[in-house]
Amino acid sequence: MAMAEMATKSSLSAKLTLPSSSTKKTLSLRQVSVSLPTSTSISLLSLFASPPHEAKAAVSIPKDQIVSSLTEVEKTINQVQETGSSVFDATQRVFQVVGDALKPALDTALPIAKQAGEEAMKLASPAFSEASKKAQEAMQSSGFDSEPVFNAAKTVTDVAQQTSKAIEDAKPIASSTMDTISSADPSVIVVAAGAAFLAYLLLPPVFSAISFNFRGYKGDLTPAQTLDLLCTKNYLMVDIRSEKDKEKAGIPRLPSNAKNRVISIPLEELPNKVKGIVRNSKRVEAEIAALKISYLKKINKGSNIIILDSYTDSAKIVAKTLKVLGYKNCYIVTDGFSGGRGWLQSRLGTDSYNFSFAQVLSPSRIIPAASRSFGTRSGTKFLPSSD
């Protein structure tokens, strides 16, 4: 009932906005507009605010919705971090975005979540123990055993705060804490989700490591980020689009030093006879592509792999499958090549695709790069006004 009331009230506001300039702290930073859909905040808060007898209801939220919520919050965190804010300032600003939109619903339906959230935000300050105690008491008063949640979140934060390499040292512990999210026990899932939300409030950068366990792969990279990593870091990009799609839309335009870091492994359509006996042919095709990638000589389990497809649907499956196979540094290009925020719309430039010069993993063999490598014809495609 409380969740239904929240959903009804949340539909009245479309977007979250930061407080007016009169209530903002004066920051010598470039201001950035940060917003989150109300449904995003509800999905996250409902997971950790539900008492035990409502655990099943909380877990009934579709996993895709949870993943979408985590992605949106992560984007907001990244926006805040771009301004150069301190951890505490960033926490305040991001939490303000979440709290403002939920205020009407929280005041009536989830007062415990509101109290716990406000106290959790204070954990970034020196008064850690007192704030932790108050938040724990607020949650326990609703009948929800919050101790496992706070212990998990505190583990992440304590380790992060004990070293100058805060984020890097906290990531493996954050991931370890969240491994239990795959458990079938609803109460365990609620506790793990609560730890994720509190860790996000306490130390926003660690949230990326935690959300990895929900998402199933490392993260999304914008076309600009992808280009930068291919040019300056040891990253590889695997283009899983079909030959037909590449002929039609083109391939990413890359500097010469980055072209040898791109491999084409087209998704292969299953024979009609096989399609008729499998439940999800698209998933099978993507999983086969992931298996091929795992056998590439130039890729190992420590490799940084970026998956590119047309609209990311298959790329997500490939990245998740690779993670299951032990390849944990797998990313996808946001909106793929042809999506609204994809490579084509990024104005980074595209080249015409010439199949005869493509490095391709065929059904039975890998065509040597020495004889076939990514190349272009003389024409170069750009969006209008991209000069």
Swiss-Prot record:
Keyword Transmembrane: yes
Induction profile: By Ca(2+) (at protein level).
Biological process terms in GO annotation: cellular response to calcium ion; de-etiolation; regulation of stomatal closure
Post-translational modification: Phosphorylation seems to be light-dependent.
Tissue: Predominantly expressed in the shoot, including guard cells.
Subcellular location, record wording: Plastid, Chloroplast thylakoid membrane
Domain Rhodanese residue range list: 231-352
Residues recorded as bearing Phosphothreonine in the entry: 380
Protein known as: Calcium sensing receptor, chloroplastic
